[in-house]
Amino acid sequence: MNYPPSAELNDPFVGFLEGMGHNPQASLDFFDASTKADGKDLDNWDYLVAKGDNARAWPPGDDGTPLGHDALGHALESATIGIPYDSDATPPKHSAGSTELVNRIVGEYGKNPDRLDGSPLTDSLGNITAEYMRDVQDAVGGRIEVKTYGSNAELEALADQGQLREFLGAVGKDPDAYGAIVTSQQAVSTELINEVFHQRDTYGNVLPEELSNRVAPGAEIVGIMADSRTQAVYDDKIAADAEFNEGLATADKWAGRAIDTGLGRFPVVGDAAGWVIEDIREAVVENYTRDSSAEADMERDEFLATQRAGSASAMYDATYTAAIQAGMSEEQAKTMAGSASQQVKDSYGQGRQ
């Protein structure tokens, strides 16, 4: 299955992987199977993804990156999300097999984040992370259970060991991945906030504490994303702020998909769901976009501070709106929103540690 030994930049395996990218079940089965090579069983995962003696020697492209890694990312997207990688359809609920594969992906690249430096895989891994945002927030949260869309990827152990953080940090350096992750995080956090207000009678006097628990995981994730963006722009100089702004502007579908796959727990339907999606999109673009031309001389730490303030503002607005829609007074809504905003600032700092 290795590429032919010639001077031409080609790799016939790319076409095979692109085919897998359009066939979710075949792709999932493939990554869980093995192939006969020289009379030995060769695990397809070890051959294509893991780094070891049996790993594939990928031919480099003109830019020096592995020629087939973009196609590999498409195959992984298809296998984990359950629809062709370029489809906008609502995916099926996550299966035990797809969540197990996500766990392997996070573990592999979380242990070896340097393998994602400049990799064509990162945009696909960002899409996978956005799709599994509930699983990620469930792992990061610890104090609360975040219900997942089907089976749970069980990432908590990887979060405790630091591999989830390393994975997110490496993937978030890619502008498109950054946009997908930040947008999906805002959508899931908005859902969790709305849910707690519509169940406020259950929580009584501990409602503020429950609210803080629900906004903390998302805030920690955007803290990691801010660090990743800062490293990419200021330290590694591998991307410009304009590219990250574009990543945010083109990540709309992740707001819609996060809400579509959570509507059973979200107290809106029809046109109202469309309004929620638009609110999420606007919150992300308004609070995370940076005007590079006007702020070209902004220092690294100052930029991180503005991102922290933007994250807090986005969550303040989501909390205030949810509280008002749930029938709380304006004063109560402002108090709750202020509490959520402060929790975001605290948890954002944890994400940057």
What are these regions (language model features)?
Residues 1-353:
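Non-catalytic all-alpha helical scaffold/repeat segments
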